[in-house]
Amino acid sequence: MNKKNIVLFDMDGTLTPPRKDFDKELFVPLRQLARHADIGIVTGSDYDYLNSQMKMLIKYSELRFVTHLLPCNGTKHYRPPSNSDDEYTLIHETNMQQHLGKQCFKELMSILCTSQSEMCYNSFPLTGHFISYRGSMINWCPVGRNATHEEREKFKKVDESYSTPLRLRELDKLRHRVNLKCNNQVVVKLGGETSFDIFPLGWDKTYALSHFKDRRCWFVGDRCGPNGNDKEIFDSLSKEGRGFCTSGTVDTYQIITKITQDLINDKL
């Protein structure tokens, strides 16, 4: 295992097309990168979604031995196996309900239920699994996490049909409601293409950096702009030239190649 460097990647829109499986074309640059650095996958999704989308890499590839899994913004940390007989080991996790207290958590859930009922008047499809509590964060998906690709596309079309996108309007409203009840101790961000992430202040993706204080960290993600869930960690590492914003898996390929070359040059 490389102790000096680790490159952290967002998942959806970075290593995979949104809500789809790992792009196998990235095996080539990632294998080259792994000679010089460990790999981390930091995502707002929970472990089950990460495992499902990244199965080709973390179950059936030798890269599993150098790849850290950091679901829920890195508030959970799964250490890579040391040999072919081992599995990933959960070595750190946090609990949002305990951190905020039962009353604040209950208020949050009530706000999200109200917001979901209000969103039902729009013309996008409704499926199921609208609110997902992941231990250290809450994900609210108005179209439902059970939505098919086609249903997600319909939601995006409705979202973007307004002069101010529907999710951005809802984001402002939701932040106002949450701050009134939780004294500005809770953050609400856009999550991926269709949802919202809700978590305690400070539990954004910069949390993942706390697991690697003895290493140089890089980050590659696609949601690095205002309201995006990659913004904080991107901004933090960009100050040192180690934050990269990608437009998709093809761009990620080029970024990995650049980081690898920089690491090689650094050793010369």
State what each model feature region is.
Residues N2-I6, F22-D23, D197-L268:
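Mg2+-dependent phosphoryl-transfer enzymes with acidic/Ser/Thr/Gly-rich catalytic loops
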Residues K3-L8, K24-A37, R177, K181, ...:
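A short, Lys/Arg-enriched amphipathic alpha-helix followed by its capping loop at the start of a domain
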Residues V7-D12, P71-G74, P81-N83, R134, ...:
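Short loop/turn segments at strand-loop or loop-helix junctions that form parts
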Residues D21, S45, G135, E193, ...:
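Short beta->alpha linker loops
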Residues D21-T127:
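Active-site phosphate-binding/coordination module
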Residues Y47-D48, K76, G144-A147, T194-S195, ...:
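Short, solvent-exposed loop/turn segments at secondary-structure junctions
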Residues S123-W218:
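Conserved acidic, metal-coordinating active-site core of Asp-based
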